[in-house]
C-alpha cells in the first residue's frame, strides 16, 4: 500500500512539474541584444513609427527605404533594445500598375542591431549598420481587389509618384535569415492563395519630402527618400523552453520512471 502511495505521489509530482514547466515555456527571448516576450498578448507586433522611402512611378522601378523599429510587442526601445537601435533597410520592384493599384515583387527587409545608437532619420547611412539580426524575404500572395499575385500591394491616393494621405500597403514576408529567424518561422499568416507566410506587413505613407529637399539620385542623401510612413509587421513567435524548466520536468519524469521500475522489479521478485 505504501509503495502504491509512493508511486501516486511521484506521479502527482511529475504532473505538477510538467504544468509548471509548461507555464514557463514562453519567457522573454533575447537574440542579439533584442528582447521580447513571446507570451505577450500582442505577440507578434513590430512597428516602425517613421520610415522613409524612394518614389516610384512605373513598372521595373525599384523602391528602397530605411527606418528604425519603435515598438516591439507594445514595448518601447528601452525594453526591447536597451542601448541599441534596431534599424532596417528594404527594397521592392514594381511589377504592375493598374490605376491606383501598385504591385511589387522581389522584396526583402534586412534588420540590424546597432549598438552605437546612432540612427538619425535625416541620415540614411545610419540605417542598416551594425550586426545583421533578421532577413525577411517577400512571399507571393494575393489580395482582394488586385488582379495579380505579388509580395506587396499598394493602394494609392493621389499619384503613384506622389501619394497622398490615405495611401496604404499590405504584403507578405517570410523569415529567411539572421539569428532571429528560427524564433519567427511560424507560418501563421494566410497569403490568400491557400498558403501561409511568417508575416503580414501593413503600412501607410504619403509624399512628405524633407523641407528644402529637391529629389536626389544619391541613395545616401535623405532627399532621395521623399515619402514618409509607418508600418506594422504581424506574426507569431516560437516559444522556446527555458533550460531550467525543461530540466525539472525531465527530473520529475525520471523519478516517476525509477519508482515504477522498482515497483515492477519488486513485484517480479515476490511472484
Identify the residue ranges that each predicted region occupies.
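C-terminal segment of classical bacterial N-terminal signal peptides
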Residues: 17-24
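A short, hydrophobic C-terminal helix/tail in secreted or cell-surface proteins
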Residues: 242-261
Amino acid at each position: 500500500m505504501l509503495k502504491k502511495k509512493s508511486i501516486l505521489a511521484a506521479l502527482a509530482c511529475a504532473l505538477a512539474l510538467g504544468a509548471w514547466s509548461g507555464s514557463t515555456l514562453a519567457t522573454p527571448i533575447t537574440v542579439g541584444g533584442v528582447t521580447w516576450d513571446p507570451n505577450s498578448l500582442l505577440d507578434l507586433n513590430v512597428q516602425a513609427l517613421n520610415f522613409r522611402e524612394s518614389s516610384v512611378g512605373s513598372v521595373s522601378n525599384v523602391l528602397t527605404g530605411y527606418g528604425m523599429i519603435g515598438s516591439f510587442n507594445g514595448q518601447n526601445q528601452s525594453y526591447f533594445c536597451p542601448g541599441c537601435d534596431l534599424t532596417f533597410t528594404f527594397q521592392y520592384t514594381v511589377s504592375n500598375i493598374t490605376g491606383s493599384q501598385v504591385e511589387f515583387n522581389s522584396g526583402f527587409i534586412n534588420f540590424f542591431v546597432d549598438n552605437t545608437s546612432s540612427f538619425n532619420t535625416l541620415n540614411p547611412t545610419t540605417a542598416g549598420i551594425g550586426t545583421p539580426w533578421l532577413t525577411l524575404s517577400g512571399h507571393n500572395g494575393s489580395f482582394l481587389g488586385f488582379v495579380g499575385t505579388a509580395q506587396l500591394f499598394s493602394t494609392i491616393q493621389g499619384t503613384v509618384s506622389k501619394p497622398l494621405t490615405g495611401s496604404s500597403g499590405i504584403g507578405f514576408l517570410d523569415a529567411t535569415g539572421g539569428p532571429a529567424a528560427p524564433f519567427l518561422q511560424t507560418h501563421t499568416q494566410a497569403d490568400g492563395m491557400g498558403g501561409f507566410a511568417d508575416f503580414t506587413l501593413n503600412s501607410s505613407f504619403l509624399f512628405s519630402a524633407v523641407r528644402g529637399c529637391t529629389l536626389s539620385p544619391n541613395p545616401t542623401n535623405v532627399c532621395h527618400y521623399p515619402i514618409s510612413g509607418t508600418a506594422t509587421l504581424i506574426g507569431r513567435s516560437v516559444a522556446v523552453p527555458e533550460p531550467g524548466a525543461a530540466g525539472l520536468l525531465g527530473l520529475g519524469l525520471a523519478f516517476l520512471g525509477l519508482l515504477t521500475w522498482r515497483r515492477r522489479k519488486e513485484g517480479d521478485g515476490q511472484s
